[in-house]
Structure formats: C-alpha cells, structure tokens
C-alpha cells in the first residue's frame, strides 16, 4: 500500500505550507491538529480522473479519526463538531494563487450549535456564509461574483454599506 498522508518535513512531498507546519510542530510550537495530503496524492487524483481513490480516502479518514481522538471533537457531530481548514500548497510560495476552504464541517445544524456556544450568532452565520462561498468557488466552480451580488443586494435592501452591518438574520437568509 502506498502512503499518501504524512506529518513529516518534506517540502517536495508536502508543499511549502505542509512542510512549514510540520517543522513548527517538530519545534513544539502551538500548531492546530492537522495532517497533510501529499503532492503525490494530488497527482494520483488527476491520474484517476479527478477521483479520490479508496486507498487515499482511507488514509484521510484515518487521519481525521486521529484528529478526533486528540481534540475530543467529531467531524460531522452537531454538538461537538470538528471544523477543519483545507489549504492547497505548492513547493514554492504563491501568495493569492492557492485555494483555501475554511470551516469544513459546518452545516445548518452545526452553525446553530456554534452560534449558541459562542454567544455570537452573527459571527457563526458569517462563518457559514463564508464557508459556502469558498466551497462553492473552489469545489463547485461557482464564481464568487454570484455571492457578492447577493450580498450587495441584501445590503441595498437593508440600507447598509458594509458586510459587517448585516445581522445574523440577514446572513442566515443569504
């Protein structure tokens, strides 16, 4: 079986971000729990017709299980959710060129839990709105402009100029 997921310091295999996070972890710096899917797994994904094969998926799920054990949180659990960020990386730094999805694991049930736990429903719904926008753009290839148009329309309807002036109910409607 090939190994697709690592926690080691290997820039060519892990990309710059993955290697830097691994190095910070090795130095004992406070880094959130995580794992890196290798550049070889990405190559395999394309060779498999843009599908994640069973072997890679099994290792990703194993890494998520390990994160759950360490954090005490569970991916997909509405009461104690594990939220993750997915960041792409290359060997060399390419600011603004690589995709990111924050708060993977949020859904309509989890966002309600997050709103109650944080005491800040506006923040929770804004996180969810941003997650949907990022996921739609990066994964579903739905352009950001459609979301920006909806936000602009909502601001116009509410008579406000800034996104931060929209309240939790506004963001929930979006």
Residue ranges and their predicted role:
Residues 1-174:
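Nucleotide/phosphate-binding sheet-loop regions of phosphoryl- and nucleotidyl-transfer enzymes
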